[in-house]
Structure formats: C-alpha cells, structure tokens
Amino acid sequence: MNKTYLILGGGGSFGIHTAKFLIDNASPKKVIGVGRNPLRSEPFSLGIQNEKGFEYFTRHITYEFDLLLELLDQEKPDIIINFAAQGEGAVSWRNSWRFFETNSMALSRLCEELMKRNWLERFIQIGTSEMYGSVNHPVKEDEPIKPSSPYAASKVAFDLYLVSVFKNLSFPMNVIRPSNAYCPGQLLHRVIPRTIWCGLTGNKLPLQGGGKAEKSYIHARDLARAIMLVSQEAPLGEIYNVGPKEPTSIREVVERTASALGVPFAEICEITEDRIGQDSRYWLDSSKIESQLGWSQLIEWDEGLKEMVQWGRSYTSQIKNYPTEYVMRG
C-alpha cells in the first residue's frame, strides 16, 4: 500500500518480526525501526538490517525526545506502531516510576506532539493482556481492567489516555492487546528461549510456582499479521484483543519446549517459589478482530517451537554466555 511504517521499539524481537512481516506482505514504501539501543548481534537482530526497504535509528524516547521528533518530522511516517516499553511485570515492583516514565509519560508526551502534525494517519499501541488481571474466562475488550503489577498499571494508563484523546481530540489511534508472544530472536529471560538455552547448555530453568500459572501464547508473526490488518482495515479508535483460543500453563509450555528439544522435562527445570503479583490466568477473547478483520491464529505450538529450537541450535555458541535475567535499561 506504499505506506511508511515506523516501529518504536523496533530493535526488540517483536518489532523486528513485525518489520519483516510488513516488508514481505504490506508493500510498504519504507519500514523504519527506532530503538533506544543499537541493534543487537545476529542471533537477536535476525539480519533485519540487511532487508531492502528497512532503516534503523537509535533514539531514546525519554532522553532523546527532541532527536526523536526531528526524525519523525524528517520521515513523516503514515503509521506508527509502538512496542516501546519497560516490559517486565515481575521486576516492576522496584523503581516503578521508571515504568510510568516510559510506558505512560513519554508516550503521552509524544502523542501531544504528534497531534500538532498533519502527516500521521494512524498510531497503533501494543498493549498487554496483563491489564485484565487474572481471569476465569476469555475476556473481551470492554471488560473491567484489573492490573496486578505496576507494569500493567503503567500500560493501562496510556491505553486510557489514547481512548480519551481519540474521543475528544480525534487522535487517530488503535490499541492491540496481545497475549504473550514468542519468536526466534527473543531475549533469554523469557520462558521459551530460556528453556531452550537451558536444554542446550545443561543449565536448570527456575520454574516459578511449579509453572501452574496459565498464559496465552501466539507467535510474533501472528501478532504482526494482526498489526498489518489493523493498520489497513480497522476503524480508528477500536481496541482489539489478539490471542489463541485457550491458555496454556507455564509447566506445559516448558514440557512442550523440552519435548521439541528432545530433553526430559525433569532434567531441564527446578521448582522455585512463585513471584509476587503472579496472576493465575491470562485468557483473551479475540472474536472481535476475527470477525471484523479476519484475523486468526495460524502458527500452532509444534510449528512455532520447532522454529524456536532451530534458532537456538543455530546460535548455541553465540547465546551460551548471554544474560538470562531481565536487565532494566534507561
């Protein structure tokens, strides 16, 4: 469609997979990635820097705000997709202000500036299923919001800001609230790549609470397809859940991953205490995006985990000494 897409948080694994998907499927004029850090090495960048029609810029949304605005005014993207966030609920109980600084304040400041420009067609915010809290049924977009961590609360704050500026100031926005995504190139503190890392290096995965918590998972390419559909077809102002039909316990995720590796489950993990604020179940009703935009989950567990294991085996030597704990960056 010859649009220019700009992806904030474009150096992360989901931003990279979205960029690749748009280049392959959306006929873009250009896809621009923007991140607070330079692109990581090949196991995590997936060669995105070599894609024709892709450019990457290092700009910090909080501390280099003026430089970011200069870039936006230079490129004048038709569509901005925002993945940029402090994104780990488990560590958000300390330095909680850092999560609000990025996830709420910096983004609302950016949108105020965008409202002064006339070139933006659509701003797509990537939210989180965590804002619904723990649920006992698949939740729809209009159900009560019950965040259980400072991280989730910071994401809720910006979602509600977007709703208000769309309603009162006609800011052209959409929100996608996806379930947990996974993909090759994902950093090793996430459960699936960390399980693969443990299986390949002989380390043990700390399985918090025995893995009884249930979450919903989709492959990053399924999320990218939802983003493309929203960018092309969604009415402005709409919010969409994006996830599978059923949740999966963390234990089952680890069991499936161990099986894909060919490593016994008992050899790959050890049971540890549950983390503070751990919700028991995330479960989304995605019928709205399915009926309105024709989205559906295409990549099932077997295909997705096979791809993840292939990625891990291909880069074992590069990732074996890579950090497996979340590091909060500025």
Descriptions of predicted regions:
Residues 1-181, 315:
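N-terminal Rossmann-like NAD(P)+-binding domain of SDR-like oxidoreductases, especially those catalyzing
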Residues 9, 33, 199-330:
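C-terminal substrate-binding subdomain of Rossmann-fold SDR/epimerase-dehydratase oxidoreductases
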Residues 26-29, 99, 165, 186-187, ...:
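Tryptophan-centric aromatic hotspots in well-structured domains and transmembrane helices
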Residues 66, 78, 90, 97, ...:
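Residues in well-ordered alpha-helical elements
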Residues 67-75, 113, 198, 226, ...:
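CheY-like receiver
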Residues 88, 128-131, 135, 191, ...:
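Activation loop
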Residues 143, 147-154, 184, 188-192, ...:
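The catalytic Tyr-centered alpha-helix of NAD(P)H-dependent dehydrogenases
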Residues 157-165, 195, 253, 257:
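Hydrophobic alpha-helix immediately C-terminal to the catalytic Tyr-X-X-X-Lys motif of short-chain
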